[in-house]
């Protein structure tokens, strides 16, 4: 995954995790999973509900927070010319 991809995903997922925001995760096959982000790394998200599920990121289509979240904005990377 590119560095820019991580710069977008990590703050978003970390905010969802720290604020215990309920989420709906839609998989590429159309299945909807619901719960809270318990943990994540480069390849998987641990989704906690009545049980904890390990969801591989490559199987995820969309993550929809149950409420509005504010994502912290870091410094914008500059491209070298």
UniProtKB/Swiss-Prot annotation:
One of its GO terms (cellular component) is cytosol. The keyword RNA-binding applies. Keywords: RNA-binding, Stress response. It comes from the Bacteria. One of its GO terms (molecular function) is RNA binding. Residues 10-69 form the Sm domain. One of its GO terms (biological process) is regulation of RNA stability. InterPro entries: Hfq, LSM_dom_sf, Sm. RNA chaperone that binds small regulatory RNA (sRNAs) and mRNAs to facilitate mRNA translational regulation in response to envelope stress, environmental stress and changes in metabolite concentrations. Also binds with high specificity to tRNAs. Belongs to the Hfq family. Homohexamer. This is RNA-binding protein Hfq. It comes from Methylobacillus flagellatus (strain ATCC 51484 / DSM 6875 / VKM B-1610 / KT).
